[in-house]
UniProtKB/Swiss-Prot annotation:
Record domain RRM: where: 20-98, 106-186, 244-322
The keyword Disulfide bond appears for this protein: no
Classification via SMART domains: RRM
InterPro entries: ELAD_HU_SF, Hud_Sxl_RNA, HuR_RRM2, Nucleotide-bd_a/b_plait_sf, RBD_domain_sf, RRM_dom
Free-text function comment from the UniProt entry: RNA-binding protein that binds to the 3'-UTR region of mRNAs and increases their stability. Involved in embryonic stem cells (ESCs) differentiation: preferentially binds mRNAs that are not methylated by N6-methyladenosine (m6A), stabilizing them, promoting ESCs differentiation. Binds to poly-U elements and AU-rich elements (AREs) in the 3'-UTR of target mRNAs. Acts cooperatively with cribp to stabilize AU-rich sequence (ARE)-containing mRNAs. May play a role during gastrulation. Required for the vegetal localization of vg1 mRNA.
Name of this chain's protein: ELAV-like protein 1-B
Key words of the record: Cytoplasm, Developmental protein, Gastrulation, Repeat, RNA-binding
Compartments, record wording: Cytoplasm; Cytoplasm, Cell cortex
Family statement drawn from the similarity comment of this UniProt entry: Belongs to the RRM elav family.
Gene expressing this chain: elavl1-b
Organism: Xenopus laevis (African clawed frog)
Length: 326
């Protein structure tokens, strides 16, 4: 998940705007800013409505802010619209708070969850520790099954710290393996490679099954986890501003961009795919590149797809480095 919540609140909440500013979570992915404004205008006069989008890819991050002219309208909007079902989403409406150090860096990364746990199950498990701003369970879009990874953003860092202290290494109901609960990595920090190394060698990765696209003609089969160990030694050649570039090697001659979209799309937002082709034959030369906007999602894609078989080829997937093909 993005740090858009804190970034946006830094911009819009420098002044005390009282009890008129609302944060709206779990919006449908295709909902527009105009539709957001229209929905909340049915309650009262809206001063501003802002749908938060990814700064690189431009897609909705699933939440936004609505500021009313009248505090009573804001309170009525919470009472009326909180819990409203929109498409497949149940939106959450609550007061937004001005940015402060107490709410910075309160985003948690959870891995090793039972695949049967839903987003509501995860929220219910962490709710005793404080107010949850938003949450997300990573799901394979082809099968609809959980990948056992989630992100939860608390209202305060202290609440997130308490959740880590209580649940990191804990075995939730229905799991024979302990889960990992830690602060989500900031792509600008040097810790990002440590996170990737942990993902690649975690118990959840060893015991988790492969990603299967049953309805498609491509099927992935896992190799030994040791085959992925080389990922942790590379230097990431990317940045949060340009996205995270992933290098895919050993593609078949018939591979095309559609295959890469199918492979990496279930893991998160993909902004660009490119298959490198022979100039004369227009056949794939055996490698390609995928750019993803979110570091954690890119790392999970690498950990899941490196060493998998596509047709008769075993793929090598890693962050692009200066030594990768150009």
């Amino acid at each position: 998940m993005s740090n858009g919540y804190e970034d946006h609140m830094d911009d819009v909440c420098r002044d005390d705007i009282g009890r008129t500013n609302l944060i709206v979570n779990y919006l449908p992915q295709n909902m527009t800013q105009d539709e957001l404004r229209s929905l909340f205008s049915s309650i009262g006069e809206v001063e501003s409505a802002k749908l938060i989008r990814d700064k690189v890819a431009g897609h909705s991050l699933g939440y936004g802010f609505v500021n009313y002219l009248n505090a009573k309208d804001a309170e009525r909007a919470i009472n009326t619209l909180n819990g409203l079902r929109l498409q497949s989403k149940t939106i959450k409406v609550s007061f937004a708070r001005p940015s402060s150090e107490t709410i910075k860096d309160a985003n948690l990364y959870i891995s090793g969850l039972p695949r049967t746990m839903t987003q509501k199950d995860v929220e219910d498990m962490f709710l005793p520790f404080g107010h949850i701003i938003n949450s997300r369970v990573l799901v394979d879009q082809a099968t609809g099954l959980s990948r056992g990874v989630a992100f939860i953003r608390f209202d305060k860092r202290s609440e997130a710290e308490e959740a880590i202290a209580s649940f990191n290494g804990h075995k939730p109901p229905g799991s024979s393996e302990p889960i990992t609960v830690k602060f989500a990595a900031n792509p600008n920090q040097s810790k990002n490679m440590a996170l990737l190394s942990q993902i690649c060698h975690s118990p959840a990765r060893r015991f988790g099954g492969p990603v299967h696209h049953q309805a498609q003609r491509f099927r992935f089969s896992p190799m030994g986890v040791d085959h992925m160990s080389s990922i942790s030694s590379v230097n990431v050649a990317s940045s949060a501003s340009s996205g995270w570039c992933i290098f895919i090697y050993n593609l078949g001659q018939d591979a095309d961009e559609g295959i890469l979209w199918q492979m990496f799309g279930p893991f998160g937002a993909v902004t660009n795919v490119k298959v490198i082709r022979d100039f004369n034959t227009n056949k794939c030369k055996g490698f390609g590149f995928v750019t993803m906007t979110n570091y954690e999602e890119a790392a999970m894609a690498i950990a899941s797809l490196n060493g998998y078989r596509l047709g008769d080829k075993t793929l090598q997937v890693s962050f692009k480095t200066s030594k990768s093909h150009k």
